[in-house]
Amino acid sequence: MADIQLSKYHVSKDIGFLLEPLQDVLPDYFAPWNRLAKSLPDLVASHKFRDAVKEMPLLDSSKLAGYRQKRLAHLQLVLITSGYLWQEGEGGAVQRLPECVAKPLWNVSNDLGLKPVLTYGDVCLTNCRVKGGDIEVMYNLPGGAGTEWFLKVCGLVELTLGKGAQSVQNVLDGAKANDKAKMTSGLTELTTTIGNMQAALAKMNDNLTPDHFYNVLRPFLGGFGGPASPISGGLIYEGVSDAPVTMIGGSAAQSSAMQLLDNLLGVTHSPDKQAFLDEISNYMIPAHKQLLADLTKMPRKVPQIVAEAKDANLSKAYSGCVAALTQYRTYHIQVVTKYIVTASKSDSPKSLAYKDTGKSDLIPFLKEVRDDTEKMQK
């Protein structure tokens, strides 16, 4: 069996998929990016952000040094893009991105294998810095404390998984060595981790209202292209190409966490649901996407090992872990209902990720994925 080590995929056994601590600003040459990204909320509120972007010089992204600087640059540039596009709301969106943003964003994206659009990997995994065991949000989108809380809670969920990453590694190592005791221990610990992730997600209710998420923050997570998008024809990246580009918006569906747990536990989905999840994975950090792919290639999957072992303790640990993941997904449906479905006051509510791909059946989709998980207990 292939030896899968999380550390080879930019996954830390302390903070999981979050990026290891880095400086919150780029070198002085990139001061215009630093300044605009930091001042985005205030400049958008005063309707001066677009003008400030137009005055920004075209900087040479090849002066960025190393992976972490490029990740930070990508975060800054997609935030600047978001502020520029959505400063006047969905009704006032523009269809062209100035070259001073578009060209370096395109180049940095190519260097990293990322999409040139705001993703979960940017606003959460790069943007949320672990400090003193807590999450510090480096850059905020419009909306003040409510928006910052949303980003922080996303980071807390990821950090909680990160603290349990060793249990994931133990399951993988146990599966490779056919070590039933190690697998049992890993699955038991992972069950606790998933429960803790649900508790972290529940903190969303403390300082974020549905109205704030849906009407203040959500538009700035938007993608472009397609009949449901305010930028229906796609976005033109000036200085790159005159052909409009279509991208889906930032969404927690782009987190690798749930697909990691699915692939580890052997949860499978119907072809149409898997096709959407595969499309979403194209918006993940490439190393994280590769981890998910490598997990699916394991010659002997965890459910098979559990079934063949006929070990009561291992079976109980596996079933408990699947039950915890099922419960997490049930709670996540409640969160989505509160912050998207109810807040939208629409007969066919859509999250932006689903809008941009033409899917309007958000809640049925999530319920089917939850049910796919629950079936693994039988």
Curated annotation (Swiss-Prot):
Instruction: Enumerate the residues binding heme.
Output: 332
Question: Can the keyword Lyase be found in this entry's annotation?
Answer: no
Gene Ontology cellular-component annotations = cytoplasm
What Gene Ontology molecular function terms does this protein carry? heme binding; indoleamine 2,3-dioxygenase activity; metal ion binding; oxygen carrier activity; tryptophan 2,3-dioxygenase activity
GO aspect biological process, one term: L-tryptophan catabolic process to kynurenine
Further information in the entry reads:
In the presence of tryptophan, the autoxidation rate of the protein is greatly accelerated (25 times).
* Function text: Serves a reserve supply of oxygen and facilitates the movement of oxygen within muscles.
Among PANTHER family, the record links this protein to: INDOLEAMINE 2,3-DIOXYGENASE
User: Which protein is depicted?
Assistant: Myoglobin
The species is Haliotis diversicolor (Abalone)
